[in-house]
Amino acid sequence: MQLTELSIKSQNKFVQHYIDGENMSSFFDYDIHSEDVWQKRLHDLSSQPFAREELADYLSSYHEKFHSAAMQASIEKLRDPKSAAVVGGQQAGLLTGPLYTIHKIISIIVLARQQEEALQIPVVPIFWVAGEDHDLEEINFVHTSTENKGPVKQKLPQSYWKKTSAAKTELDQEKCAAWIDEVFAAFEETDHTNTLLQNVKRCLRSSETFTDFFELLIADLFQEEGLILMNSGDPGIKKLETGMFQQILKHNHELAKAVSDQQRLMREAGYHPIIESDKDQANLFYEHEGERFLIEKENGVFVIKELDLKWTNDELHTHMEEKPECFSNNVVTRPLMQEFLIPTLAFIAGPGEINYWGELKRAFSLMGFRMTPVVPRLNITILERHIEKKLSERNIPLQEAIEHGTGHLKDTYFEEQIPEEFSSVMEQAKSQIEAVHKRARDEALKVDSSLEPLLQKNAAFIQDQLLFLERTVTKRIEEKEGFVLRDYERIQNSIRPLGAPQERIWNVMYYLNRYGPKFFTTFKHLPFSFQNQHQIVKL
């Protein structure tokens, strides 16, 4: 396995400017390109209070189910008042979700390890599992591929309440086991298949919910790294969050304005906000009979219109004290809750997160925080040996394949195989035959005008015969050049499937099945660097 790098620009202007080190002080509190950024952050953390003992006690209890000494050792480090954490998060996707989830976790672990050594303090990796997220349509599938087909979405055939959180949505064991079999049936059987499949099913049997299944698989993959999993949908953590819920309530109007003002600033700078903010949103969810509902503001009170529920500020404050497990964060308040709970040295962010965190600087300031340094996660493409060989054979630069795919190159190659004169001759034939046929039609209509429909049908039939000739020739070219054309398709499917980055479509199970556990052990210990270069892992 070999690690190389490429310089690939982000298509998001805001993200690229951030990566390039342009002045973004209007959007972020720390300059991640500054040499003393980590010392500054540690200094700021030293004056910020954290309920370290309570957090460690909760996490220690929650992690007992993983039976991991490394996890517990990381949790114990959090009790040290000098310790800090590198944090990142993602939804609880089936079979761990797209590859970028794995890449984000590796980013968290690598940066935590690097900073622990550089700063000589305990730095722990924490992965924030979005268990309170209720958009299950985003996590209930994986993509698979066969030799003759590109990516196919394989969705878990299970019905569920639309607004139930991932942490509380039970998996149908029978349906999920059958679905896993279908996913693995799409893989080529290898020496690793049976062991991997049985391990995945073992994790499933020990799971009740989407989040359980996700966490057990992640804990298994990163069992030696001391990765701490923080499930935002677990009722146990809500007691620790109560104080922040109440602060969000207290400053609710100002919070909505802070986000709106920051988004206006972003637009004025020529960038595009992505958070859908509304001055009537309370930026919190409320759980009622297993479903999540957005709390809104109306005429000075807090309401859930679908349920006809209303609270005054004082009533909601008391309810938060008594039933914190009923409340959860949205895209605006989740980062604030993270800052409240965890002594965060750095936040590992994907491109979309970099954009929307830039919309929250004033929200952080309002709540008395400085936004943690936001570090772009590692962008990784896995280059399999047979794909690298095909790139060389077809003389395709790897950067071209990653940035643009090979579909356009396939089309160009195919067009070049069509005889130069064939297309023009066919167009001439269609035009000339139509001209002659039109004269014949005109003469025939002089005999009987009612022949018009029949004559038009005859003209169309003749043109169809010419199209048949054209299709026959192109089909023969496809058959003749099929081997080469399939090479272009294989490269596209591997490196830029569905026209998207590899990490957004493919799942780690394909690689674990094909290359085995040693592949993953080597992969996660590669010397990745945070130089904002695209990482190429050659197998």
Curated annotation (Swiss-Prot):
Alphabetically, the GO molecular function entries are:
ligase activity
Q: Which InterPro entries match?
A: Bacillithiol_biosynth_BshC, CC_BshC, Rossmann-like_BshC
Superkingdom per UniProt: Bacteria
Q: Which Pfam families match?
A: CC_BshC, Rossmann-like_BshC
Main enzyme class:
ligase
Q: Which residues form a coiled coil?
A: 455-475
Q: What is its EC number?
A: 6.-.-.-
Keywords on this record?
Answer: Coiled coil, Ligase
Query: What does the function comment of this entry state?
Result: Involved in bacillithiol (BSH) biosynthesis. May catalyze the last step of the pathway, the addition of cysteine to glucosamine malate (GlcN-Mal) to generate BSH.
Q: Family per UniProt?
A: Belongs to the BshC family.
Can you say what this protein is called? Putative cysteine ligase BshC
Could you tell me which species this protein originates from?
Bacillus velezensis (strain DSM 23117 / BGSC 10A6 / LMG 26770 / FZB42)
